[in-house]
């Protein structure tokens, strides 16, 4: 299980999870705003 550059891979993984977290927060914000404004 040796990879050429494990540090780069972990950074890519963290960035991807960060984007998913921001997307989830955005979706929740839209749902809550729709709930409160209706």
Swiss-Prot record:
Keyword Transmembrane found: yes
Transmembrane stretches, start-end: 17-37
Membrane topology, from the record: Single-pass membrane protein
Single biological process term from Gene Ontology: photosynthesis
Protein origin, superkingdom: Eukaryota
InterPro entries recorded: PSII_PsbL, PSII_PsbL_sf
Main location, first listed in the record: plastid
Entry keyword set: Chloroplast, Membrane, Photosynthesis, Photosystem II, Plastid, Reaction center, Thylakoid, Transmembrane, Transmembrane helix
Matching Pfam families: PsbL
Keyword Nucleus among record annotations: no
Localization per Swiss-Prot or TrEMBL: Plastid, Chloroplast thylakoid membrane
Gene Ontology cellular component terms for the protein in this record: chloroplast thylakoid membrane; photosystem II reaction center
Family to which the UniProt record says this protein belongs: Belongs to the PsbL family.
Annotated function: One of the components of the core complex of photosystem II (PSII). PSII is a light-driven water:plastoquinone oxidoreductase that uses light energy to abstract electrons from H(2)O, generating O(2) and a proton gradient subsequently used for ATP formation. It consists of a core antenna complex that captures photons, and an electron transfer chain that converts photonic excitation into a charge separation. This subunit is found at the monomer-monomer interface and is required for correct PSII assembly and/or dimerization.
Subunit structure: PSII is composed of 1 copy each of membrane proteins PsbA, PsbB, PsbC, PsbD, PsbE, PsbF, PsbH, PsbI, PsbJ, PsbK, PsbL, PsbM, PsbT, PsbX, PsbY, PsbZ, Psb30/Ycf12, at least 3 peripheral proteins of the oxygen-evolving complex and a large number of cofactors. It forms dimeric complexes.
HAMAP family the record matches: PSII_PsbL (MF_01317)
Protein name, per record: Photosystem II reaction center protein L
């Amino acid at each position: 299980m040796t990879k050429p550059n494990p540090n780069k891979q972990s950074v890519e993984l963290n960035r991807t999870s960060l984007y998913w977290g921001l997307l989830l927060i955005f979706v929740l914000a839209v749902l809550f705003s729709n709930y409160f404004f209706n």
